[in-house]
């Protein structure tokens, strides 16, 4: 399980484009595209090294007006995916 104190940071060589309904991530080294929904795009934009998992969940909770446990679950799920796909610094 993802530690709530972990501080996710997006790799510098990853390109991101915001869309009306989320965003698109392009991994230049793997030449892969990842489509993000609005929630995942919000979380992606928070992975700048200035917040830990719990802080991102708290911001999502307030921004999207969802219960904190749902926000934390969404953050864990998204960051786990980002890690699995190699989009974050290890």
Predicted feature locations:
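Long, charge-rich, low-complexity alpha-helical segments
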Residues: 29-90
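Acidic, low-complexity/disordered tracts enriched in E/D and polar residues
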Residues: 1-41, 45
């Amino acid at each position: 399980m993802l530690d709530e104190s972990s501080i996710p940071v997006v790799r510098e060589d990853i390109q991101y484009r915001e869309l009306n309904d989320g965003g698109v991530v392009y991994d230049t080294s793997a030449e892969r595209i990842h489509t993000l929904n609005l929630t995942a795009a919000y979380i992606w934009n928070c992975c700048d090294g200035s917040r830990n998992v719990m802080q991102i969940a708290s911001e999502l909770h307030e921004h999207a007006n969802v219960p904190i446990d749902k926000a934390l679950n969404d953050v864990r799920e998204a960051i786990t995916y980002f890690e699995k796909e190699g989009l974050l610094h290890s």
